[in-house]
Amino acid sequence: MICTECENDAFDEEDDGYYYCQRCGVQVENLIQTGVDDGDLIGEGGGTQGALYNPKHRRTEPQPITPSQPRFTDDTSRYSQFKSQFESENGNKELPREVKRAPDSYVDKEPTEPVDFAAETLSYENYYDEARDRYVKAFLMMITYQCDALVDKFNVTPLIIGLVGPISLRYVALSGVYHKDWANNAIRDSEHQSEDGEVKDAKRLKRHKAEPRNIDGKRAVTIWFGILKKTMPLSSSLVISFLACHQAGAPVLPTDIVRWAREGKLPYLSCFLDIREQMGERSAACPVKVSIMARPFQVISAQMLEARASVIADTIGLPLPPVNFYGIASNYIKQLSIPEDKILDLARLIQNWSLPPELYLSTNEQKLPSRVCVMSILIVAIRMLYNINGLGVWERSLGFVNASDGDSETNSGTAEKATEFDTQELLKNLEAKYHEVAAETLESEKDLVSYLSLGKNEFFAGLEEDSPDDTYRIVDNLWNGYPKDEDIECLPKRGRDWDDDVSLNQLSLYDSRFSDGNNPCSSSSRRNESVSIGLDLSSSEHRESSSPEKLKEIAIKRLITDMGDDLFCYIPPRVKVKRLDYLQYVRKKEDGALIYAAHADYYILLRVCAKVAEIDVRNMHRGVLSFERRLAWIEKRIDQVLHLTRPLMTCKHCCDDGNIGEDQDD
C-alpha cells in the first residue's frame, strides 16, 4: 500500500478506524479497520451485508476527505513546496523512499505458521533453563502435596513440613542438574550413545525447527527431560516424603507410603493434574506437556523405597536415627489384637539391650527391611511370655496329643505356665486373625464401582482431555448410567472367606467346599480319594458320629498343607523335654535346598506376624533367626565381658603416671 500523494508506504491507524500517511497525513481511501475476520465480511448470498465494524468505531455519516483537503494542511503545503522544488531541480525524478531495516533476529523466510506478535527468538539457554526449572518445580510441588496429605489425612506430625524443605532442596542441589555445563554434557552424552557413531543429517521438522538439536537430529528438550528423569525420578518424591517422616520419628512404614500411593490417598499418580493448574500445560521454551513431564506410570516397591531413602540420606549427608520402634511395635500389636502392656514393655527392654543395627535404614536392597527386625523382636517377646517353644500347646488344644507317663510332670508344669498367659487362647486368636488379615482387601478393590473409580481417577487420569475422538465421552456416558442400572450387589474380593467365621476345630474335608475337586492343581488320585470319602460319609448322621480325633487329625493335616505351601516342614510336638528354655530353630540343607522346619504353635505365630508386616513367611523366619543369633551371641559374651580386667598400662593423661591395675585393686 502506497500513498497516492507522497508515495510513502508507512501509515498510522487512528481512533476513527482510518489510516493516514505518516509523511503527508493524507487519509487512505478504500481502507478501513473493521476489527473482524475476513470471513465475516461476506454475508448470506455472497454479499457484504455481514460486514461488521469494530464496536469501538461508531457508525457515523462519512464525510469524504479529498486530497485537496488534507488532514495536516501545514505539513502538506510545506511538503508540496518541497516536492515541486525538488522535481524542478532533479528533472521530475522520483523521491527516495524509506528503507525499513529488519531487526537482527530477522529470518530470511517468512514463517509458515502463525506466531506470537513481537515474540523474541528463544536462545539455547532459554530452552534448557525453562525445561530444567519446570521439571524441578513440578518435582517440588509433588513433594509438597504429598506432605500436606500426610498431615491432613493420616495425622502425621506437622514437623515433616519443616523437614522436607531442606531435604528436597539439598537433594536437588547435589543432583548436578544446575551445573553450568549440565545441558552441554547431556547433549554430548547423547551423541556418544549413537549406534553407528557416524554423523547423521539433522532433519528438522517444520513444527520444531527452531528448537536446538544434537548432531543426530534429536530434540534437545527430550534429551534433557530424559536426563532429568534419570537423575531425579518422580518416584524420589515418595522417597523424600518417607524420609521426612522417618526423620521426624513418625511411625510411617514404606509399606504405608506405597499402599496409600496406589490407593490414590497420597498424591502421586494423578498429582500432575494439580501441577498443571498451577504451572500451565506448556510454555514457549518448554513444549513438553506437564501430563508427560510430571506423570509417573508406576509405584516403586516398599523394599526399593526404603533402600533409596538411605541412599538419598547418604548423598545429602543426613544422619538418620533408627526407626520409631515404640510407635511401629504399638501399631503391630494393635493389628494382632494382643494385650499390649506386658509384650510391649518386654519388647522395649529387649530392643534397648540388644540395639540391633537392623533398625537403621540400609542402602542394600537385598537386605531385610527394618520392619522385619521390629516384628522379630515382638515374636521373641511373645514366645518368651507365652512359652511358645514347640511343646504342643496347639495340638493339645485339639485333644489329639496325649501326654506320656514319662513326661507328665513336665507337661503339667508347662500347662500351668500356659494357663497363666492363656497360650491356647492366644493361638486361636492369632489363627483367626491370620484368616481375617488374609481376607482383607483394599478399599478400592471391595467392589467393582470402587475399582473402576480408582482406575478412572488415578491410573487413567487426564486421558479424557487428550482423547482426539469421543471415546472417553462415550465411556463417561456409560459410567454415569452404571450405578443406576446396576442392582446386583458386588461381593468383595476375598480369599478363603469360608475360614473367617469357622474355627479350625470344626473344619472338615468332607464338606464340598473343601474337596480337592475345586482345586485345579490337585492330582487325580487326591480328587478320587476325597470323592470316595465324601461318598462314604455323605449322611449328616455319620458326620455327627465321627470321632473328634478324626476331625482334629484332619485339622493338623490342613495345617501341614498350609506349611507346605510356604515351604515349611511340620515338626511334631516335643516329648520328654529336659530343658524348658527358649527353643531356637535352624535351617538345614537337603539336596542343595534349605529346609524350613518349625512346630505348629511357632508357625501359627510366625505366619500371622508375616502377614501383618507384609513380608514373606520365610523372610520373616530369617529375620527371627538372625535376631535370635544376636541375642545368643550377647548372652555368650556378656559373662566374659563382665569378668574382664583392665590391662596393666600407664597413661600420663588420665592416671597421672599411675598404674591402672593398681588403682583398680585399691
From Swiss-Prot:
Species per Swiss-Prot/TrEMBL record: Arabidopsis thaliana (Mouse-ear cress)
Name of this chain's protein: TATA box-binding protein-associated factor RNA polymerase I subunit B
UniProt-annotated stretches for the region N-terminal cyclin fold: 81-285
A GO CC annotation given for this chain: RNA polymerase I core factor complex
Region (B-reader), start-end ranges: 30-64
Domain of life: Eukaryota
Cited InterPro entries: Rrn7_cyclin_N (IPR048540), TAF1B/Rrn7 (IPR033599), TF_Rrn7_Zf (IPR021752)
Keyword list, A-Z: DNA-binding, Metal-binding, Nucleus, Transcription, Transcription regulation, Zinc, Zinc-finger
Segments for region (Disordered): 45-110, 189-208, 515-548
Subunit structure: Interacts with TFIIF. Interacts with MEE14/CBP1, TBP1 and NRPB1 (via CTD).
Entry's localization field: Nucleus, Nucleolus; Nucleus
Other remarks on this protein: Expression of MEE12 in the central cell alone is sufficient to restore the normal pollen tube guidance phenotype.
Basic and acidic residues composition-biased segments: 90-110, 189-202, 539-548
Written domain comment of the UniProt record: Although it shares weak sequence similarity with GTF2B/TFIIB, displays a similar subdomain organization as GTF2B/TFIIB, with a N-terminal zinc finger, a connecting region (composed of B-reader and B-linker regions), followed by 2 cyclin folds.
Transmembrane region(s): none
Encoding gene (name): MEE12
